[in-house]
Amino acid sequence: MRMSRREMLALSAVAAAAMPLVARADVAGTAPDSLNGLAAAKGLRFGSCLGTGPSGAPRQAGVTGDRANQFDDERLKAIFVRECGVLVPENELKWYAIRPNATDFDFARADKLMAFAAANGLLVRGHTLLWNRDIWMPPWTQSYNFGPQPAKEAERLLTTHIQTVASRYPQVFSWDVVNETIAPKTGEMEASVFTKAIGPEVIDIAFHAARAAAPKAQLVYNDYMSWGLGNKVHRDGVLRLLERLKKNNVPIDALGVQAHIGPGASDSTNTLEGENEVAWRKFLDEVTGLGLDIIITEFDFGDQTLPADAAARDAAVAATAKHYFDVMLSYKNLRYVMAWGMIDKYSWLRDRMPRADGLLKRPLPYDDDYQPKPLREAIAAAFRAAPERRWLLS
């Protein structure tokens, strides 16, 4: 499997000063039997998030913050470089990570990840330029004085942020421009400091600003709608948003499907079969009909209600995940898959919705001892079975 010249040259702005952080013989994820290698054989790519600190958002309820710094884990990074061709910063590009106040930016953690990606030949996704929910914005935004012309000032603040971040990292080939702006229970746009000042057009402004700052990047709306019970309202709300953006010639290229799946996930609590699968495929068909690509952006598996026995649990996770990937990969406008972590112990799900029996969740392709699990083989098998397609950057 040969990597494209563009991928080989996907270097960060800070690459010149970066030293290789993991010993490697070639560009990351090029081994034919790696997950990225198997994906690339079908015109796909595979990657994962990686963080520079304890996994999980610092303001998220229940996050303990006591796990080891994953970026200091050389075994994790070795697995990452072997298996992945794409890196997305877990939290390091979010407003709360880089905006200590209204005038300053702190890119130290993000720069570290960009240097790692450059040193190892990894493509980079960006997540996220606007998480349009107040709970995930830095506290100072709630008391910010937007002055006598709040709409104008809010637009300035937002566009300055997007232009500053996106222009700093021109190597990012795909940006989550807006994240989770549709309320699952109502299907309407979440209220935020920006929607209060500007209205729903804040989303349009964000995408136009992203296109101006990153003219060649794939621009994405990212959300966690699913086939699950009661999710029709969420799906319909996302579709209405996408339809409006396309109608208004807003520069959007793809829908990111977060894919936190499983009976203990935040997105879906029932199985992808029967009427659920019909409804989900209908949604994906409608997204495809808008001319948009589809991306799996944050895959993991919540196993909180599955059997206690690890072998039985892992087998159930693998079987369910294999079917999910088979459904998703049947769409040729889906060109890459991102996991939300590679090693169980660094998953944000370890701190979210714990199992009643107290056992630790096993949501990712590798276990706490850095050994591949049946989930890893399920993903590999899905790539082997996937129809071929043209890679996004060809």
Residue ranges and their predicted role:
Residues V86-P100, R109-S226, D303:
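Substrate-binding cleft and catalytic face of glycoside hydrolase catalytic domains
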Residues V22-C49, S394:
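C-terminal segment of N-terminal export signals and the immediately downstream linker at the start
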